[in-house]
Every structure is written in C-alpha cells, then in structure tokens.
C-alpha cells in the first residue's frame, strides 16, 4: 500500500486564510466529549495498533520511509532522517484504525533543520479506498518558533495558516492538537485554542500519522535541505477523544 500525502507549498495568499476566526475555549473532557479517551504511548511498537511505513513516497519527499528509522527510546518514538547506500531515508508511523470527529493531540519535539518537516496529522485517500481528506500540524525545520496548520477536503487544500508560538518547539516537548467537528477545526497549543477554520471541512475518518522527512523541489516552502543526517523528531504520546454523541 502506497500513500501519497502531497502537501502544497506555501503561497503568499496561503498564509492569510479567510477561514480564521476568534478561537473557541478548549473543550473539557467529560463535557465536550463522551468520556471515550484513547492515549497511545510509545514504550514499544504495538503492532496490533500501529504500522511503520516502508516505501518511497515520491514527489516532494526526497527520502524512502523505512522501519529502521522508527525507534523507541526512553518511552518515546524517534523518527529519524538519515542516509544509506540508496539515498536518504526517513520515518513514518501510523495507526491501523481510522478516527473521525474528535480531539487529536500529540506531545512532541520537532527537528530544527532547513529543508525538513516534522508532522502530526490525520490522513485518508485513494490508497485507503476513500477520497483524500487530511488535517495537518507541520513544523518546518528552518524556523521552529512557528507551526503550520493545514487541511485537505477531497484533495482541495490551500488552507495553510502559520501560527507564531512564542517559543522554539525544537527545544522541548509541548502539546499540539486539533478539535475536528462537523463544521470546524480548531487547533491548540499547550491546551490553548489558537486558530479555527470553518470553510469546506473534511468529513472522512483518517489514520493518525506522524512523520519526519526532507524535501526536494520545494525550497520556497521548506528552504533548501543541507544534507544533514541522523536528525530526529521525538514523540512522547498521542491521544484521541471522541465527541459526545
């Protein structure tokens, strides 16, 4: 199974989304949700719940996903960008199950390096027998004092929004997330709502995914990759809370 997770390069217009609105207060478990709470930690590879990607993604991804780059150290998942005799290698980790509306969160520390992306997102597409729907949290390694939010509905993107964090995400673990509802997506940083989108919201359940990769042909977006290897993004845990019925 090959998953093509195309992420559009930023445009000037993409930085200013017409969907921005005043963020809503953070939902409180037990009131906004029905009490269904699933925490996924990374003490070891749970093969019944997760899978490691093992293929080249092509296009702007200048590396090959390999399970060798998905490691578990000190209770954390480490996704590494490296190189072998065939070229650059990178890491991607995903759930086997699909998740719909609800609160998605990750505690992570991204890579600080030009030309690379560290991410947390939901995705489903043609390789899953569905339309392409996706919701993204992406760190562009050239400047980890900001984070990019984005989403795709039936393959239609251009919803990029840059949020300035007020800290360097690569220097420590922080919690990032999004609350996906039928008519909106609200993104969070350390429990505080920072951005909401309302336009053409995706509706297809997707897999929870994380990856770290180096780009090619997207220098305007990521800045040129400098060839540095053995660099890693770290993930402490992810969680999913289902909404109240």
From Swiss-Prot:
Q: What reactions does this protein catalyze?
A: Hydrolysis of (1->4)-beta-D-glucosidic linkages in beta-D-glucans containing (1->3)- and (1->4)-bonds
Q: Name the predominant localization.
A: secreted
What range(s) does the GH16 domain occupy? 30-245
Keywords attached to this Swiss-Prot or TrEMBL record, sorted alphabetically, are: Disulfide bond, Glycosidase, Hydrolase, Secreted, Signal
Could you list the residue ranges forming a coiled coil in this record?
none
Signal peptide (UniProt feature, chain positions)? 1-29
Q: How does activity depend on temperature?
A: Optimum temperature is 45 degrees Celsius.
Top-level lineage group: Eukaryota
Task: Kindly state one GO CC term assigned in the UniProt record.
Answer: extracellular region
What's a single GO MF annotation on this record? licheninase activity
Q: What class of enzyme is it?
A: hydrolase
Gene Ontology BP terms: carbohydrate metabolic process
Name the PANTHER family for this protein: XYLOGLUCAN ENDOTRANSGLUCOSYLASE/HYDROLASE PROTEIN 8-RELATED
* Protein name, UniProt field: Beta-glucanase
Species? Orpinomyces sp. (strain PC-2)
Q: What is the lineage of its organism?
A: Eukaryota, Fungi, Fungi incertae sedis, Chytridiomycota, Chytridiomycota incertae sedis
């Amino acid at each position: 199974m090959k998953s093509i997770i195309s992420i559009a390069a930023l445009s000037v217009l993409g930085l200013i989304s017409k969907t921005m609105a005043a963020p809503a207060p953070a939902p409180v478990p037990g009131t906004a949700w029905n009490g269904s709470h699933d925490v996924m930690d990374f003490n070891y590879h749970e093969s019944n719940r997760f899978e490691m990607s093992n293929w080249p993604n092509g296009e702007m991804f200048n590396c090959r996903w390999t399970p060798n780059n998905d490691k578990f150290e000190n209770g954390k998942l480490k996704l590494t960008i490296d190189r072998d005799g065939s070229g650059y290698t990178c890491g991607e980790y995903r759930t086997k199950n699909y998740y719909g509306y609800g609160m998605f969160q990750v505690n992570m520390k991204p890579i600080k390096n030009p030309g690379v992306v560290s991410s947390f997102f939901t995705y489903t597409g043609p390789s899953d027998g569905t339309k392409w729907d996706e919701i993204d949290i992406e760190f562009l390694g050239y400047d980890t004092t900001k984070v990019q939010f984005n989403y795709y509905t039936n393959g239609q993107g251009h919803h990029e929004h840059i949020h300035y964090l007020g800290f360097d995400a690569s220097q420590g673990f922080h919690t990032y997330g999004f609350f996906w509802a039928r008519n909106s997506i609200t993104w969070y940083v350390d429990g505080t709502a920072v951005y909401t989108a309302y336009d053409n919201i995706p509706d297809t359940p997707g897999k929870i995914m994380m990856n770290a990769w180096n780009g090619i042909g997207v220098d305007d977006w990521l800045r040129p990759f400098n060839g540095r290897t053995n660099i890693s993004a770290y993930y402490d845990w992810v969680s999913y809370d289902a909404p109240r019925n």
